[in-house]
Amino acid sequence: MNPYILTPDLNGEGLHIGIVRARFNEEIGQAELDACLQKLGELGVDERDIMVVTVPGALELGVALSHMAETFEFDALIALGAVIRGETYHFEVVSNEMARAISRISLETGIPVANGVLTVDTDEQAQARAAGKGGDCALVAVEMANLVAALEPEEDDEDEDEEDEDFDDEETDRR
């Protein structure tokens, strides 16, 4: 058996990437962003093809990601930030709702969203993971953008025109 295997494509040339970073826990989010931008550059993404916006906190990431997905032609999106556990249930609410929003946006739009929002117990844990997570998100965004593009059916203008004509004829016959 010889299955067709799509191998990971980490060539970022020509890709358009949108990044949303939460400003809450500023130092951690900025460390993630710096590492992410560096890795995107290493992967060949032109800095002119990257848009970065910031939002107040993790719960606002979803709104910005949703508008970016609907308004611009991004190949992938990246969410960055940190939610650090406190003494109340708020951590669970923010973490769960933020993750749910990110997944929903990706599934509903078909645009990959790399979730780089750290959910940790302490500032030290967040600081230790920030740069690595930012770079990982760049890799995920480029790989998934290329995978989605590879899985898209190729458009054949002549076949589309014929299909449109056939569909129009069927519609006419039904009336």
Curated annotation (Swiss-Prot):
Pathway membership: Cofactor biosynthesis; riboflavin biosynthesis; riboflavin from 2-hydroxy-3-oxobutyl phosphate and 5-amino-6-(D-ribitylamino)uracil: step 1/2
Signal peptide: none
Record's keyword terms, sorted: Riboflavin biosynthesis, Transferase
Reaction(s) the record says it catalyses: (2S)-2-hydroxy-3-oxobutyl phosphate + 5-amino-6-(D-ribitylamino)uracil = 6,7-dimethyl-8-(1-D-ribityl)lumazine + phosphate + 2 H2O + H(+)
GO cellular component: cytosol; riboflavin synthase complex
GO annotation terms (biological process): riboflavin biosynthetic process
Annotated region (Disordered), positions in chain: 151-175
Binding site for 5-amino-6-(D-ribitylamino)uracil: 24, 58-60, 82-84, 115
Protein EC: 2.5.1.78
Entry binding sites for (2S)-2-hydroxy-3-oxobutyl phosphate: 87-88, 129
Comp. bias (Acidic residues): 152-175
Superkingdom of source: Bacteria
Keyword Transport attributed: no
InterPro entries reported in the protein's UniProt record: LS, LS/RS, LS/RS_sf
Disulfide bonds: none
Active-site residues (renumbered): 90 (proton donor)
Similarity-based family: Belongs to the DMRL synthase family.
Protein function: Catalyzes the formation of 6,7-dimethyl-8-ribityllumazine by condensation of 5-amino-6-(D-ribitylamino)uracil with 3,4-dihydroxy-2-butanone 4-phosphate. This is the penultimate step in the biosynthesis of riboflavin.
HAMAP family named in the record: Lumazine_synth
Name of the protein in its database record: 6,7-dimethyl-8-ribityllumazine synthase
Origin species: Bordetella petrii (strain ATCC BAA-461 / DSM 12804 / CCUG 43448)
